[in-house]
Amino acid sequence: MALHLTLARPYAKAAFADGQKANQLEAWLAVFTAFSKIIKNKEVARQIINPKFSDKEIKTLLFDLIQTIEPESTKQLKDKIDHFLQLLIDEKRLMILPDIALVYQQLLNKYQDIIEASVTYVFPLNDEHRQQIQKQLEKRFNAEVKLKMIKDESLLGGVIIRAGNWVMDGSIKGKLTRLAENLKG
């Protein structure tokens, strides 16, 4: 995964720089998000690595799929997507498209001063609790916060909140682990 992110970074940065210059940041995000979903599809992935298909056939398949999923963004970026796909095909790097999407999203979040935070829970939180968590995180980090909700029954209760390197473990599992460590002394 780390290698894929390293390989993906220059591609994401190049697309981001182009998106900034041409005021097409959101269009590129939509395209990369769609490509990520396409590449994660097992049938599509099989076709991409199948030597029976030529590079041209693979490129046509991917372009047709992206055009179906994201017609507006594809229309805006048609020639750029075509060039981008050809570059990835030539370099045998199509399978890192999900990683390119991830790095691109991180670049866009940083540019827009947005922090992604994950809230891991056992029991679903109501809208009021989500809003309280979001407001507290926005106050703490002085930035807009996007919450990602993750269900994990192994926590037993409570929540774990992660934002970048910052972690707040308010789970029962975490409390029991800390108690056990303290008792061991």
From Swiss-Prot:
Q: How does it sit in the membrane?
A: Peripheral membrane protein
User: Organism's domain of life?
Assistant: Bacteria
- Keywords (A to Z) from UniProt: ATP synthesis, Cell inner membrane, Cell membrane, CF(1), Hydrogen ion transport, Ion transport, Membrane, Transport
Localization per record: Cell inner membrane
One Gene Ontology term, aspect cellular component: plasma membrane
Q: Name one GO molecular function term.
A: proton-transporting ATP synthase activity, rotational mechanism
Gene3D superfamilies for this protein: N-terminal domain of the delta subunit of the F1F0-ATP synthase (1.10.520.20)
Q: What is its main location?
A: membrane
User: What does this protein do, in the record's words?
Assistant: F(1)F(0) ATP synthase produces ATP from ADP in the presence of a proton or sodium gradient. F-type ATPases consist of two structural domains, F(1) containing the extramembraneous catalytic core and F(0) containing the membrane proton channel, linked together by a central stalk and a peripheral stalk. During catalysis, ATP synthesis in the catalytic domain of F(1) is coupled via a rotary mechanism of the central stalk subunits to proton translocation.
Q: Which NCBIfam families is this protein grouped with?
A: ATP_synt_delta, PRK05758.2-2
* Family indicated by similarity: Belongs to the ATPase delta chain family.
Kindly state the subunit structure of this protein: F-type ATPases have 2 components, F(1) - the catalytic core - and F(0) - the membrane proton channel. F(1) has five subunits: alpha(3), beta(3), gamma(1), delta(1), epsilon(1). F(0) has three main subunits: a(1), b(2) and c(10-14). The alpha and beta chains form an alternating ring which encloses part of the gamma chain. F(1) is attached to F(0) by a central stalk formed by the gamma and epsilon chains, while a peripheral stalk is formed by the delta and b chains.
The protein's name in its UniProt record: ATP synthase subunit delta
Q: What is the lineage of its organism?
A: Bacteria, Pseudomonadati, Pseudomonadota, Gammaproteobacteria, Legionellales
Gene coding for it: atpH
